[in-house]
Design a protein with these regions (language model features):
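Conserved acidic carboxylate
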Residues: 12
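Active-site beta3 strand of CheY-like receiver
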Residues: 48-54
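Helix N-cap/capping motif at the beta->alpha junctions
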Residues: 34-43, 64
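Active-site residues of response regulator receiver
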Residues: 56, 86
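Receiver (REC) domain active-site loop signature in two-component systems and cognate sites
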Residues: 59
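Short amphipathic alpha-helix used as the core "switch/output" element in two-component signaling
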Residues: 43, 65-78
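Charged docking surfaces used in two-component/phosphorelay signaling
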Residues: 19-27
């Protein structure tokens, strides 16, 4: 149905940050799923394709880079916009994420939740 909320998948091992983003996105009218490591994320992506993924890069089991690579090489997933939210601030990490298909890259210590939400609204439209 056209009125169903768009689904966002947050892949973040920091429970507090994940819950904060989830609450804010739900307030904006999105349906939100959460995965707390890369392995769980890959399982969820097999079950349901979200409109957008918010992805941390430093996670246990399967890293965010590995998840991003899997998304980029999987035909059913490769069109999903991926927004990185990470502590990795080196240009080489940002470039690697972009080469693997990340649409946006936010550094956690510099992030404005309002800027993040506005970018998500644009990319998930």
């Amino acid at each position: 149905m056209a009125n169903e909320p768009k689904k966002i998948l947050i892949i973040e091992d920091d429970y507090f940050l994940s819950s904060l983003m989830k609450a804010r996105l739900e307030k904006e009218g999105f349906a939100v799923g959460q995965a707390f490591d890369g392995e769980e994320a890959l399982q969820l992506l097999k079950q349901e394709i979200p409109a957008l993924v918010i992805l941390d890069l430093i996670m246990p089991k399967v890293t965010g880079f590995e998840v991003l690579q899997m998304i980029s090489i999987t035909p059913q997933l490769d069109k999903i916009p991926v927004v990185i939210v990470s502590n990795l601030a080196q240009d080489s990490d940002i470039e690697k994420a972009r080469q693997l298909g990340a649409r946006e890259y936010f550094i956690k210590v510099k992030i404005s939740i309002d800027d993040l939400i506005e970018k998500i609204k644009t990319l998930a439209a």
